[in-house]
């Protein structure tokens, strides 16, 4: 039966499982390119306030038609309360999130910005636990795994921030120098990935991850009362643009900052808006719907590896011992958290099956575990389907 279903979902003879893996690998390359392109944009002098404004305008233009036509029936009437919630989501999920990311990226490097993002699932879990949105069962392996994973992520972020360490790889001496000589017209405008203030950059990236995690946590109750994901994202983008414009009005006084001075600058903004916010959004929502949230999250470290290769070639990025150690700890922590979430779903599925069985036979049975947990936190766009995991 499963094989027949898989065959029906095949495209040009390619089974859906393989489609999902190809899509996720492609998605990581798209996101990895965004890290490198964003750093290149900063190297070229694009304003940290102008860049996100243009990026979110493009994203909003891409999202609006889909939100309007696909969610006509399920979109509730807009109220002042909803507008306030969307404004708050934009403040943490767009303005703080993207602002801290660009500040952190400007002071560190694409690879370690990507490495820090691997800690978001653990920070989200910790934040939800502290707010009592999610319960922690320390007497079960899923609870222990999530606590251990969170501790590893915190340790990794601390190592990256507090210990830079010696340089263990410098591509500029061979590969990057050769490429820069033979392709100077292409690579020269990109600049390099030399960090300015490593510790400050890492603090900014921690702020980025905290903002991202807070956005995930607080978006869950909003989606319960306003179950139109595309519309919520569109409103969030809109208010994010307004907030960045207000900040730019006070902090960005140079009118030339809003003008594109080269084709490279235009390319970086189009890439960020179309690929990172448009195409990637569509691919991710399909992969989550068909493969489940854990399947999608497992591929995140692949992005870090791809970023390292891209940044080394295009920007001549150097790698530091502290960054490598921290990245390994964070990725290990990510997988512990994902394992804990997977085990949690198994417990929930067993409990649900037991309840259904009891109802069918008219017999009252004890739950599978009196400590069974009901997950109450939902990552945006993360459907619970795990058909292909």
From Swiss-Prot:
Keyword Ribonucleoprotein listed: no
Localization per Swiss-Prot or TrEMBL: Vacuole membrane
InterPro entries: EamA_dom, WAT1-related
Tissue-wise expression: Mostly expressed in stems and hypocotyls, also present in seedlings, root, leaves, flowers and siliques. Ubiquitous, mostly expressed in vascular tissues and secondary wall-forming cells, including developing xylem vessels and fibers.
Any one Gene Ontology BP term: auxin export across the plasma membrane
One Pfam family, short name: EamA
Phosphoserine found at: 372
Domain of life: Eukaryota
Molecular function per GO: transmembrane transporter activity
Ranges that cross the membrane: 18-38, 49-69, 76-96, 111-131, 143-163, 198-218, 230-250, 266-286, 294-314, 319-339
The EamA domain, residue ranges: 32-161, 210-339
Main location: membrane
Topological relation to the membrane, as annotated: Multi-pass membrane protein
Deletion consequences: In stems, defect in cell elongation resulting in dwarf and bushy plants with altered mechanical properties, as well as little to no secondary cell walls in fibers, including xylary and interfascicular fibers; these symptoms are partly reversed by continuous light conditions. At the flowering stage, red, dry and bent downwards stem apices. General repression of indole metabolism, including tryptophan, neoglucobrassicin and auxin (indole-3-acetic acid). Broad-spectrum resistance to vascular pathogens, including the bacteria Ralstonia solanacearum and Xanthomonas campestris pv.
Gene Ontology CC entries for this record: plant-type vacuole; plant-type vacuole membrane; plasma membrane
Keywords on record: Amino-acid biosynthesis, Aromatic amino acid biosynthesis, Auxin biosynthesis, Auxin signaling pathway, Cell wall biogenesis/degradation, Membrane, Phosphoprotein, Plant defense, Repeat, Transmembrane, Transmembrane helix, Tryptophan biosynthesis, Vacuole
Functional description taken from the UniProt entry: Required for secondary wall formation in fibers, especially in short days conditions. Promotes indole metabolism and transport (e.g. tryptophan, neoglucobrassicin and auxin (indole-3-acetic acid)). May prevent salicylic-acid (SA) accumulation.
PANTHER family: WAT1-RELATED PROTEIN
Protein family per UniProt: Belongs to the drug/metabolite transporter (DMT) superfamily. Plant drug/metabolite exporter (P-DME) (TC 2.A.7.4) family.
Protein's UniProt name: Protein WALLS ARE THIN 1
Taxonomic path: Eukaryota, Viridiplantae, Streptophyta, Embryophyta, Tracheophyta
């Amino acid at each position: 039966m499963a094989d027949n279903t898989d065959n029906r979902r095949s495209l040009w003879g390619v089974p859906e499982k393989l489609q999902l893996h190809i899509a996720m690998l492609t998605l990581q390359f798209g996101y990895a390119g965004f890290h490198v392109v964003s750093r290149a944009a900063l190297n070229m002098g694009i304003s940290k306030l102008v860049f996100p404004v243009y990026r979110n305008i493009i994203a909003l233009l891409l999202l609006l038609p889909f939100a309007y036509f696909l969610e006509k029936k399920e979109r509730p009437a807009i109220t002042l309360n909803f507008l306030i919630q969307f404004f708050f989501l934009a403040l943490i999920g767009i303005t703080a999130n993207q602002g801290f990311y660009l500040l952190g990226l400007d002071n560190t490097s694409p690879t370690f910005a990507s490495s820090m993002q691997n800690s978001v699932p653990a920070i989200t879990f910790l934040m939800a636990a502290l707010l009592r949105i999610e319960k922690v069962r320390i007497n079960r392996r899923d609870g222990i795994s999530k606590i251990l994973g969170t501790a590893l992520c915190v340790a990794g972020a601390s190592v990256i921030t507090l210990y830079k360490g010696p340089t263990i790889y410098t591509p500029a001496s061979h590969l990057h120098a050769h490429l820069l000589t033979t392709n100077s017209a292409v690579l020269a405008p990109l600049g390099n990935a030399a960090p300015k203030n490593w510790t400050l950059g890492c603090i900014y990236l921690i702020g980025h991850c905290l903002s991202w995690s807070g956005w995930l946590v607080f978006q869950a109750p909003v989606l319960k009362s306003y179950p139109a994901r595309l519309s919520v994202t569109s409103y969030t983008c809109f208010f994010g643009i307004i907030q960045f414009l207000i900040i730019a009005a006070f902090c960005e006084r140079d009118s030339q900052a809003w003008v594109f001075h080269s084709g490279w600058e235009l390319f970086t903004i189009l890439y960020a808006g179309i690929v990172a916010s448009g195409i990637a959004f569509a691919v991710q929502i399909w992969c989550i719907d068909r493969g489940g949230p854990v399947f999608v999250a497992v591929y995140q470290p692949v992005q870090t590896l791809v970023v390292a290769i891209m940044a080394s070639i295009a920007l001549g990025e150097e790698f530091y011992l502290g960054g490598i150690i921290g990245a390994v700890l964070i990725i290990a922590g990510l997988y512990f958290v994902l394992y804990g979430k997977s085990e949690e779903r198994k417990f929930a599925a067993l409990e649900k099956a037991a309840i259904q069985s009891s109802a069918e036979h008219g017999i009252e049975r004890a739950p599978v575990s009196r400590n069974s947990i009901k997950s109450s936190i939902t990552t945006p766009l993360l459907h619970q389907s795990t058909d292909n995991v």
